[in-house]
Each structure stands twice: as C-alpha cells, then as structure tokens.
C-alpha cells in the first residue's frame, strides 16, 4: 500500500506540474499499472531490471508526455507497435479513455502480460494482440506509436502502410538524432513519400531522467 501511495504522489506531482487533466481514478490506475509492470517484470523481461529511475517516472510519465505533443482525440485509432509491457499504450489508454489503442508485439509472453494487466485494470479501450507487423493486414490507423530502438527509417518502412492520410508516427527516442532523421527523410521515396516532415522535441526539461531523450513526430 505504501508503494502505491509513493507511486501516486510522484505521478501526481509530475502530471499536475504539466497541467495534465487527469481524474483521481486515472491517477490510481496509472500508479496501479506501474506496480503491475514491476510485478510482471519479475516473471518476464518487459523492462530493464536495473532501473535508474522509478518505473512511474521512467516509463509511465515518459509515455504520457506523448499526449503533450500530440493531443489524442475521441475515436482516434492508435497502433502501439512493439508494445513490450504495454508501453506507451496502456498509460495512454488510461489517460485518454475515448481513444482506441491496439497494442501489438511479436512475443507471446509479453502480450499475455499486457492482456492480464488490461483485464485487471479494467481498461476497455485497449486491446493487446500477439502478431508480427508483417501480419497486420487491412488495418489503418490515425497514429502509430513506438518506443523501439529501431532506426527511424526502419520504423517508417514498417508503418507507412498502416497510416491514414494526415496520420503520423510518434516515437520516443534517445541520442543524437540528426543523421537518423536525415536518413528517414532521404528514404521517403521508398515509402510513398512518408514522412513528409519530421519534428523532434527534447524532453530533458520534464525530468533529469530524460536527458538526451526526445519525442519524434513523423507526418504522413
């Protein structure tokens, strides 16, 4: 119970500072998810087991920051590609209950953990699916999310076929991204002109734990 309260207090302080409009029940669910993620991580490798920051900051708040740069809307269809332990999809589904999230990963054990957490938390706007990206056919989305370490050009190659016109790919990435962005833009002729533009935003100011971290938005 003490751990839950500590997670809740840390998250409330960060989110309220950024004027994120979350209800008490949403804070409760986000803190509960952080604890579930840690519990599941002891059984399955979902996140690093040598964390240098609290999970609620490094993973939950980190995911929520996407919504500051891309306000999710009611009815928006979002694909979380390579979700792992439900990141960023589960925190975002809690914070934006009218947006629909499909969480996909090629590792069955990780998806089983996501399905169990979604069920325990009572989240109705998120579905976890065991699938490879190549097997997703006939589906289109307004937005694709990724926390994968894959190069941006590779992520664009994976996702352009799923994006609706005016859709975007949002990535949480780290390091010097100039060359990675230039490579993705140079290769857009191979991906039906995607991305048309790429914006990137440093997020180190939100927390010392996000040094050299950025949010990248590639527009269809």
Swiss-Prot record:
Keywords, comma-separated and alphabetical: Cytoplasm, Methyltransferase, rRNA processing, S-adenosyl-L-methionine, Transferase
Entry binding sites for S-adenosyl-L-methionine: 82, 87, 105-107, 133-134, 147
EC number: 2.1.1.-
Pfam families: GidB
Keyword Flavoprotein: no
GO MF annotations, alphabetized: rRNA (guanine-N7-)-methyltransferase activity
InterPro entries linked: rRNA_ssu_MeTfrase_G, SAM-dependent_MTases_sf
Residues in coiled coil: none
Cellular component GO terms held in the UniProt record: cytosol
SUPFAM superfamilies attached to this UniProt entry: S-adenosyl-L-methionine-dependent methyltransferases
Cell compartments where the protein resides: Cytoplasm
Main function: Specifically methylates the N7 position of a guanine in 16S rRNA.
Cited HAMAP family: 16SrRNA_methyltr_G
Protein family according to the UniProt entry: Belongs to the methyltransferase superfamily. RNA methyltransferase RsmG family.
Protein name as catalogued: Ribosomal RNA small subunit methyltransferase G
UniProt organism field: Chlorobium limicola (strain DSM 245 / NBRC 103803 / 6330)
